[in-house]
Amino acid sequence: MKLIDLDGRVIEVENLDLALLQADDYRHYRVTTPTENDIYRYAYWEDVYQKLLKLKTEQL
Protein backbone atom coordinates (compact mmCIF):
# COMPACT_ATOMS: atom_id res chain seq x y z
CA MET A 1 0.00 0.00 0.00
CA LYS A 2 1.12 3.54 -0.65
CA LEU A 3 0.10 7.03 0.39
CA ILE A 4 1.29 10.50 -0.55
CA ASP A 5 2.30 12.78 2.32
CA LEU A 6 1.83 16.56 2.56
CA ASP A 7 5.21 17.09 0.89
CA GLY A 8 4.17 14.99 -2.11
CA ARG A 9 6.42 12.06 -1.21
CA VAL A 10 5.18 8.52 -1.71
CA ILE A 11 5.25 6.44 1.47
CA GLU A 12 5.16 2.66 1.18
CA VAL A 13 3.14 1.07 3.99
CA GLU A 14 4.17 -2.49 4.78
CA ASN A 15 2.33 -2.96 8.08
CA LEU A 16 -0.84 -0.88 8.19
CA ASP A 17 -1.76 -1.63 11.80
CA LEU A 18 1.70 -0.68 13.06
CA ALA A 19 1.74 2.45 10.87
CA LEU A 20 -1.60 3.51 12.36
CA LEU A 21 -0.27 3.07 15.90
CA GLN A 22 2.89 5.05 15.15
CA ALA A 23 1.09 7.88 13.36
CA ASP A 24 -1.45 8.08 16.18
CA ASP A 25 1.38 8.43 18.70
CA TYR A 26 3.14 11.12 16.66
CA ARG A 27 -0.01 13.17 16.08
CA HIS A 28 -0.51 13.50 19.85
CA TYR A 29 2.97 14.84 20.65
CA ARG A 30 2.79 18.47 21.73
CA VAL A 31 5.20 21.08 23.03
CA THR A 32 4.31 23.95 25.34
CA THR A 33 5.39 26.68 22.92
CA PRO A 34 5.01 25.36 19.37
CA THR A 35 7.08 26.82 16.57
CA GLU A 36 5.91 27.11 12.99
CA ASN A 37 7.70 23.84 12.29
CA ASP A 38 5.90 22.13 15.19
CA ILE A 39 2.53 23.32 13.87
CA TYR A 40 3.40 21.92 10.44
CA ARG A 41 4.42 18.63 12.06
CA TYR A 42 1.06 18.43 13.87
CA ALA A 43 -0.75 18.85 10.54
CA TYR A 44 1.60 16.40 8.82
CA TRP A 45 0.98 13.55 11.26
CA GLU A 46 -2.76 14.20 11.38
CA ASP A 47 -2.84 14.02 7.58
CA VAL A 48 -0.81 10.78 7.53
CA TYR A 49 -3.05 9.27 10.20
CA GLN A 50 -6.23 10.15 8.30
CA LYS A 51 -4.83 8.68 5.08
CA LEU A 52 -3.86 5.49 6.90
CA LEU A 53 -7.39 5.23 8.33
CA LYS A 54 -8.76 5.59 4.82
CA LEU A 55 -6.51 2.75 3.63
CA LYS A 56 -7.72 0.63 6.56
CA THR A 57 -11.40 1.19 5.75
CA GLU A 58 -10.76 0.40 2.08
CA GLN A 59 -9.28 -2.93 3.18
CA LEU A 60 -12.45 -3.97 5.00
Regions found by a protein language model. Name each.
Residues 24-60:
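Short, charge-rich amphipathic interface segments used for partner binding and complex assembly
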Residues 1-32:
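N-terminal acidic leader/helix
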